[in-house]
Amino acid sequence: MTQSNSRASGATRDHLGRPIVAVTGIGLVTPLGIGVEESWAGLLAGRSGIRRITRFPTEHLKTTIAGQVDLPEEAGHGPLTSPGRVERMAALAAEEAIAGAGIGRKGAFPGPLFLGMPPVEVEWPQRLDLARGGVGAEGSKYPALIAAATGRTELFEGALFGGVGERLADRFGTRGAPIEITTACATGASAIQLGLEAIQRGEADAALCLGAEGSVQPEALIRFSLLSALSTRNEDPARASRPFEKTREGFVMSEGAAALVLESLESARARGATVLGLVLGAGERADSFHRTRSNPDGGAIIGAMRAAIADAGLEPGQIDYVNAHGTGTPENDKMETLGMRAVFGEGCPPISSNKSMIGHTLSAAGAIEAVFSLLTIRDQRLPPTINHETPDPAIPLDVVPNVARDARVQRVLSNSFGFGGQNVCLVLGAAA
């Protein structure tokens, strides 16, 4: 029995006998707004959330634009550090998702937490503060910094990678040890994959899956700039992110968070939950080719796409739309096109990039784009790829240029391709 027929008959198991996994809650924080509906409305309207950076001085930087999220508690105060922003945005998204799912009692989520987040470290303002606390000319040297940090437990806790997940787990009362993961730009999708597989294995009936990113800060911006990965179209921020377009020249850094409440379909039905969509399958492949570049043969990208479709029990022709990784770098868009043509042949479905409007949210991207994929299915409307002014003849794809479009969408492939060849693809489907 095919998976689609299995779902149509009301079954709760997929083509491999695993529990079908439903999404019953979603939450979003993006440069377009805080909350699912505000972000989604902005995306369908083709509105850009990219603007000039106001959080720190940019006079001597090559790139001075980003997708910033303005948090309410920052008004009139200094910005939170990156770990603080990650935790706060993850909490906002999780609160929205859990409330929408109506699951568990307050502070007691009935499943594990899977958190995708960036590596964290002490940032420049904190280092300068420690240096000032050192002794004379030796203050900037490592032993003096260690001495100045003695007793500063907030620095240690803020830069402790696992600490963010532990605090979120305490806040929402998730079960078991929280899992934090970072797989470069595939991180958010990896968190969803972990939740999907935990439910499929019967280890949990529900999971809280989060992807969060808060790295719009000087050091991260400079590091990506040194890789020549960022757009320098500073004079017109809204038009800087140009996935699949001929004049593209780099991605735009951004931040945000997304949360998904996953449940076995059987559990969701038993408690009368509203099912927003299904996570039908996941595929991952790594190529270990280079620290930042993908193998030019596209093998891992193609393999991840094919693996996700096969895991869902589908054929490529059953995918109605692809939510692109679509960063706007010359190499990534070329590689994704290669993957599309290899997997779908001449009959490629429409593909569009949310990053044209919200920028590249890095560790959060896979989770944010999974939520947008579910909303695409819900509303039967494809979000556009904006800033598509000059088509690239090397990219013969329908990229839904500039304007959203009504379409029949039952299944979406959502692509996440990360530095170091870490690739994760998800297949999302309509509720039964």
How does the language model describe each region?
Residues 1-23, 106-110, 312-318, 396-432:
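Flexible, low-complexity linker/loop segments at domain and module junctions
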Residues 2-79, 101, 117-119, 266-278, ...:
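ACP-dependent fatty acid/polyketide chain-elongation machinery
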Residues 20-24, 47-52, 235-312, 321:
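Condensing-enzyme catalytic core mediating Claisen C-C bond formation in acyl metabolism
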Residues 23, 44-179, 212-221, 316-332:
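Conserved beta-ketoacyl condensing-enzyme motif
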Residues 90-102, 161-165, 169-172, 178-213, ...:
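Active-site-proximal alpha-helical scaffold in enzymes
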Residues 135-151, 193, 197, 214-269, ...:
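Glycine-/small-residue-rich "gating" segment that lines the acyl/pantetheine channel
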Residues 155-156, 176-183, 245-249, 351-360, ...:
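Short pre-catalytic strand/loop immediately N-terminal to key active-site residues, enriched for Gly-Thr
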Residues 203-249, 282-296, 324-333, 348-398:
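Acyl-CoA/ACP chain-elongation machinery
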